Each structure stands twice: as C-alpha cells, then as structure tokens.
Amino acid sequence: PELDLVLTDEVNPGIASSAVAQARQRLGQEPLAQLFGLCASAWDTRHQRGRSWRGLARYAIDGSTLRTSDTADNRDHFGAQTYASGAVASYPQLRMLTLTSLATHLLRDAVFGEYGKNEMRYAKELMEAIPEHSLTVFDRGFLSAEILLQLQQKGVQRHWLIPAKSNSQWEKLDKHPTDYRVRMKVSPQARKANPALPAYWQARAIEIVSRHGQRRILLTSLLDAKAWPANEIAQQYEQRWHIETSYRELKQEMLGAGLTLRSGSPQTVRQEVWGVLLAYNL
C-alpha cells in the first residue's frame, strides 16, 4: 500500500502556528549548525578543484551585521549599536564573520554572536576552519601578529594577504623599491596577552596601485618572489572585493526588504542564521 503523507481533516484539522514555534524551540540551533558545517566544508572542498591559484585555495574573511527582531531577550543577548550621541539603535544587532571562497563565493565557515564582541575575537575562532594550502585575504583591521602568525604557523602552507595600515611601521630588509621584506615589532600589549609571540615578525611588502588609482602596500606571508609573483598577488587582493555581492545577496534577496531576522529569542535567532547560511550555499 502507498504511504499516505497527508493527514485528513478529521484526524488533524490543522497545525497551529504555535506548534511550529514549539518545534523550533525543541530543535535548537545545534542540528542546523552541524548541518551547515558539514555541508559547507564538503561543498567547498569539491568546488575548489581546478580553481586554485598556484596550488592555493583562496579565501577572504569578512564581517557584517544583521538586525534581529526587537525583543527584550534579543536586545539583552546580542546588544545594539550605540551612536556617538549616546542614542541606541532601534533594533538589536548581531555581528558575523564569514570565511568565503574567492573562487566560488561559497561560505566555508561562519561565526556570529553579540554585537559588542570585537571582530578580532571572532577572527580567532575562524582560524581553525581555514584549510591547508590556502591564501586568505583580510581587511586591514585584522593586521595582528597574533592572528596572522597563528594562521601561518599552524598547518601547511596557510598564507595570508592584508593591506598595511597608514600608520604601520617596519624596518625594510631589501633594496627593491616596490617588492621587499619587512620586519615589524610585535606590540608589548600583544606579547603580554600571548607570551608565545616573538619580539619581531617578518612579511613581504608589495606596493601596488589599486583599481581606484590609490597607492597601497600589501603585506603577505608569501615571501618567495619567484614562486609568488607580485602582480598575481595584487590580483588576488582585487578579487577579495567581489565577495561583497555575497552579503548583498544574503541580506537583500534572502532576508527580504526588511533585512531583519524574524526570530524572537537568541536561540531561534541563531537557528535562523544557520538556516539562512545553509540556504545561501545551496
């Protein structure tokens, strides 16, 4: 006999909306978080084939914020932006960092949570998700010996690329005018927080002109100029900006014009975010 998947009105006249909410509460966030993690890793690994640059898979770490429903629980848990005037944003917000493939725009991993938590702390949580034989492009705000050396020294061929800050200071070790090694001092504050950090660390500096005609200096762990040509490294940096379309799609197309997560509690907000991230990769 065929399996009847439709319940008749006599048996079940309808499913109350409260039953759906209760089911979500029972499910929690963990099953969706695990499903996203398993699928994201498998899909990214499969789609990276044939799309590497000189044997390196390419990624970018980028941050964004999402609004949540304005409930007391969400506001207490996630917090909200506070303006210079002292006013607080109308909606609670969560902060999110994603590890995105530059080749496919698929999400490899994501971390998110309280709005007031510093992006650097979220970035540390993403380091383990970055695979070996890879190049990860960062925003200049992540220029930190603790983060970048952690990435570089754990695993095989885990490289980074990041623009220098305007106030970055270093000792130039080579005479080449636009492609040279530099030695930078690790701040006393960083070494106090992490005594394992060295007093100095080295990087390769490459001077480029951006697509907007601005002069920039890129810092990278790709030290061998013959194995990693400067012009090709600059191209990897330019590709990083293409993932901005990922966030636009996630916010405007998947969340709708309201751009606001609908769930009313922190647990269901997290569940909803994992569901949205999973759906984006589909």
What are these regions (language model features)?
Residues P1, R24-L27, Q34-G37, R54-G55, ...:
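Single, function-defining residue in the core of a domain
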Residues P1-N12:
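DNA-recognition alpha helix
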Residues E10-L27:
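Major-groove recognition helix of helix-turn-helix-like DNA-binding domains
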Residues E10-N12, G50, V88:
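Short secondary-structure boundary/capping segments within folded domains
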Residues A16, A60-I61:
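Noncatalytic, basic helical substrate-engagement surface that gates or grips nucleic-acid strands
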Residues S41-Q48:
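A short, well-structured juxtamembrane/interface segment
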